[in-house]
Amino acid sequence: MSNTTVLLDKKTTEIIKATVPVLKEHGEAITKHFYKILLENNPELKNVFNQTNQRKGAQSKALANTVYAAAANIEKLEEILPHVKQIAHKHVSLNIKPEQYPIVGKYLLIAIKEVLGDAATDEIIEAWEKAYFVIADIFISVEKEMYNEKKNQIGGWTGFRDFKVIKKVKESKEITSFYLKPDDNLPITTFIPGQYITIKAQIESEAYVHLRQYSLSTAPGKDYYRISVKREASNQPIGVVSNYLHTSVEVGSVLPISAPAGDFILDERDHRPLVLISGGVGLTPIMSMLESVVEHQPNRNVVFIHAAKSIDHQAMRKRVSEIAKSKEQVKQYVVYSNPTNRTDGDKQGYIDYEWLKEVIPTKDAAFYLCGPKPFMSAINNDLQNMNIAQNDIHMELFGPLEPIAK
């Protein structure tokens, strides 16, 4: 990566560094305008970008954070490589192509000029054009490597491949699992617990294709994939695809999906105790990790903590209980915020610092968190207050990348 940075001369680098305060102040306004003009002039890209995230402003905020990070680290772009890889996983799952980068660059530069006005001099625009293509080349290089890796794996593929629903199981009041096997009956690639697939939902009533990522919710090594989807409110934009899956997709339905991707992954080389903490549908990648660790690391101590509204909202409750009862090294704790009965669960209300201290046996452990952003932010703060090293805390947020740790 350091080889790419030499393509930027000293003058360009200094100009980019000088714009960092401007990006901090106006970055989100620039990226909001960028998406507006990009999609107005390239409506076919609405088939790629999540329109719900566009309406909520989440995508523009995530892009603003990325642009700011790149500018702030323009002399040492290797510092943002973990962030680049995280985004690249998402890009590969969406089948983003190298030829789309110049289109994005064109409208990003237009947005910078139109939002900043006279402050965006020709010199600044020229510097950002150079910087953008250096950064784009880094993404393209990382993504090319990922595409090649997927293509060359046994059962691997790039782009989208048709899978047939072979089983549909209602797991709770809101969550249903879909078991998927390739329509061509050929092998499928394995995955690392915690990864996701992207579904291409072609809904008759919708003008554009919807692409959605769903975590794989079982251990790898099977001849099928399983996703477990929460049905969102049908009157909300966020619920378009989940309602389609719950109401219109049945056994025999065919769904195009991309190969597994994502960097929220279980490190099976680590033999320290494992603490898995999930909230709501954040259970799905955590369940994959639990299933995998009891299969491949049967002697590893595991603390499984799950927060749900009630017993009716807790997906895969019986399976987790079976594991905890049959595996002495697995300890299960369930917290209900709105329990049906006073005796339900190990705790009523919410996970808090004092309770967490009691159920976590050691600080020297690997922690994996998944759930709503406020949930993860609170748990992360509690763990840091317990002096857990940030490097030992791994988190997955469904949706555009946003900072969680303070």
UniProtKB/Swiss-Prot annotation:
Limits of the FAD-binding FR-type domain: 158-267
Q: What reaction does this enzyme carry out catalytically?
A: 2 nitric oxide + NADPH + 2 O2 = 2 nitrate + NADP(+) + H(+); 2 nitric oxide + NADH + 2 O2 = 2 nitrate + NAD(+) + H(+)
Q: Which GO terms describe its biological process?
A: cellular response to nitrosative stress; nitric oxide catabolic process; response to toxic substance
Globin domain: which residues?
Answer: 6-144
Signal peptide stretch: none
Which EC numbers does the record give? 1.14.12.17
> Where does this protein hold NADP(+)?
280-285
InterPro entries documented for this protein: Cbr1-like_FAD-bd_dom, FAD-bd_FR_type, Flavoprot_Pyr_Nucl_cyt_Rdtase, FNR_nucleotide-bd, Globin, Globin-like_sf, Globin/Proto, Hmp
The record's GO molecular-function terms, alphabetically, read: FAD binding; heme binding; metal ion binding; nitric oxide dioxygenase NAD(P)H activity; oxygen binding; oxygen carrier activity
Instruction: State the needed cofactors, names only.
Output: heme b; FAD
Catalytic residues at 101, 143
Positions of the record's site feature: Involved in heme-bound ligand stabilization and O-O bond activation: 35
Q: Where is this region: Reductase?
A: 155-406
Q: How is the cofactor bound?
A: Binds 1 heme b (iron(II)-protoporphyrin IX) group per subunit. Binds 1 FAD per subunit.
Q: Which CDD domains match?
A: flavohem_like_fad_nad_binding (cd06184), Yhb1-globin-like (cd14777)
The source's superkingdom equals Bacteria
- Keyword annotations from UniProtKB, A to Z: Detoxification, FAD, Flavoprotein, Heme, Iron, Metal-binding, NAD, NADP, Oxidoreductase, Oxygen transport, Transport
- Residues bound to FAD are 196, 212-215, 397-400
Site residues, Influences the redox potential of the prosthetic heme and FAD groups: 90, 396
What does the entry's domain section say?
Consists of two distinct domains; an N-terminal heme-containing oxygen-binding domain and a C-terminal reductase domain with binding sites for FAD and NAD(P)H.
- What family is reported? Belongs to the globin family. Two-domain flavohemoproteins subfamily.
Q: What does this protein do?
A: Is involved in NO detoxification in an aerobic process, termed nitric oxide dioxygenase (NOD) reaction that utilizes O(2) and NAD(P)H to convert NO to nitrate, which protects the bacterium from various noxious nitrogen compounds. Therefore, plays a central role in the inducible response to nitrosative stress.
What's the name of the protein? Answer: Flavohemoprotein
